[in-house]
């Protein structure tokens, strides 16, 4: 049995009191739009939305759960088996995200994407929706990169993997949808577009991305000839075994978490009240994902075990070596 090193997460965990109802309503929404998630009973995407937006309105939290249903199902569609039309499919979906009407009826993926973003439009400001749509586009761009790597049986170098895997994991889209839509937080644009807030979002996104990689790497290894995740990338690039790659993955993840915690405190201390709420609520995306992963069996086919620790493996307040694209996160 492969043991994943313990996860360090000094962030609060909470869940919306209407989590069970949201799961039922999100599932009904998915069925209405023909969104089929094979393991919905185990995954419970609506409940995940309740972890991400524990203090949001019911409508906002439900909208996040509906997007989770659609996104999990769509991600599975892109992966198993690898379809050859990924660039076409992702382009049509993003077009549907950007166009609120007329209703799309000839493609269930596009129809579902349009419908859920129309839910966002009913709940949020145009600026909030734009941030979500722009980062949704980044996700689908990253999915095309991953698809090309799988088709060509290619493992990318670490310096390439770090920025592009964050897109492919939908990490920034997830964070923004969970916080802006689920909790109805509207940070002034001047603050939202600042380098410091961008760094806050990226460090949260990368922490969550590595958590996702660590939870799923064994399952993916059984399903693809060349599996692409942080563990396999480190093994390939550094010529190390799986145990050492896991240790290095967790150390890298904890360094991102350390930087996120510093930026979270700084934004809460020096920013607007909405930025303070944004920074605090981002923490629920990280902690909520971990608790949801423990609760569900999405990755139950693996033989990995998961535990938690109060001590980071690496809390060095400096950028990790060999990844130029993230050095700026430590210069602010």
Swiss-Prot record:
This entry's Gene Ontology molecular function terms read: magnesium ion binding; terpene synthase activity
UniProt-annotated binding residues for Mg(2+) 2 = 80
* Motif, DDXXXE motif: chain positions: 75-80
Q: Which InterPro entries match?
A: Isoprenoid_synthase_dom_sf, Terpene_cyclase-like_2
Q: Tell me which SUPFAM superfamilies the record gives.
A: Terpenoid synthases (SSF48576)
Cofactor section: Mg(2+)
Which superkingdom? Answer: Bacteria
| Positions occupied by motif SXXXSXXXE motif | 212-220
The record's listing under Gene3D superfamilies reads:
Farnesyl Diphosphate Synthase (1.10.600.10)
The record's cofactor note says:
Binds 3 Mg(2+) ions per subunit.
What enzyme category does the UniProt record give? lyase
- State the reactions this protein catalyses: (2E,6E,10E)-geranylgeranyl diphosphate = tsukubadiene + diphosphate
Binding positions for Mg(2+) 3 per the UniProt entry: 212, 216, 220
List positions binding substrate: 165, 298-299
Q: What Enzyme Commission number(s) apply to this enzyme?
A: 4.2.3.159
Keyword Lyase belongs to the record: yes
UniProt keyword list: Lyase, Magnesium, Metal-binding
User: Is rRNA-binding found in the keyword set?
Assistant: no
Which residues of this UniProt protein bind Mg(2+) 1?
75, 80
Provide the domain comment.
The Asp-Asp-Xaa-Xaa-Xaa-Glu (DDXXXE) and Ser-Xaa-Xaa-Xaa-Ser-Xaa-Xaa-Xaa-Glu (SSE) motifs are important for the catalytic activity, presumably through binding to Mg(2+).
Described by its record, this protein's role is as follows:
Catalyzes the formation of the 5-9-5 ring skeleton (3S,6S,11R,14S)-tsukubadiene from geranylgeranyl diphosphate (GGPP) via a 1,11-cyclization and a 10Re,14Re-cyclization.
- What is stated as this protein's family in its record? Belongs to the terpene synthase family.
The protein's name: Tsukubadiene synthase
* Species name: Streptomyces tsukubensis (strain DSM 42081 / NBRC 108919 / NRRL 18488 / 9993)
């Amino acid at each position: 049995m492969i043991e994943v090193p313990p996860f360090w997460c000094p962030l609060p965990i909470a869940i919306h009191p209407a989590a069970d109802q949201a799961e039922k309503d999100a599932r009904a929404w998915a069925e209405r739009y023909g969104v089929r998630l094979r393991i919905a009973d185990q995954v419970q995407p609506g409940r995940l939305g309740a972890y991400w937006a524990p203090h949001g309105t019911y409508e906002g939290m439900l909208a996040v759960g509906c997007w989770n249903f659609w996104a999990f199902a769509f991600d599975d569609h892109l992966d198993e088996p690898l379809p050859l039309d990924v660039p076409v499919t992702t382009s049509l979906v993003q077009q549907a995200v950007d166009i609120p009407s007329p209703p799309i009826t000839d493609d269930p993926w596009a129809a579902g994407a349009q419908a859920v973003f129309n839910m966002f439009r009913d709940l949020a400001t145009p600026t909030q929706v734009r941030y979500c749509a722009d980062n949704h586009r980044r996700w689908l761009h990253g999915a095309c990169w991953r698809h090309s790597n799988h088709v060509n049986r290619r493992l990318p170098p670490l310096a390439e993997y770090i920025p592009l895997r964050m897109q492919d994991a939908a990490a920034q889209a997830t964070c923004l949808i969970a916080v802006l839509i689920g909790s109805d937080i509207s940070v002034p644009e001047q603050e939202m577009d600042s380098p410091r807030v961008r760094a806050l979002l990226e460090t949260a996104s990368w922490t969550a991305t590595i958590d996702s990689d660590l939870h799923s790497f064994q399952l993916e290894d059984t399903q693809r000839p060349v599996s692409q995740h942080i563990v396999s990338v480190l093994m390939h690039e550094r010529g190390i075994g799986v145990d050492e790659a896991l240790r290095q993955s967790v150390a890298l993840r904890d360094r991102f978490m350390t930087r996120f915690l510093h930026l979270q405190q700084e934004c809460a201390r020096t920013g607007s009240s909405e930025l303070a709420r944004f920074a605090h609520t981002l923490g629920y995306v990280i902690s909520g994902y971990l608790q949801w992963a423990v609760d569900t069996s999405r990755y139950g086919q693996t033989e990995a075990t998961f535990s938690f620790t109060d001590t980071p493996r690496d809390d060095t307040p400096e950028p990790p070596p060999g990844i130029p694209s993230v050095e700026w996160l430590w210069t602010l």
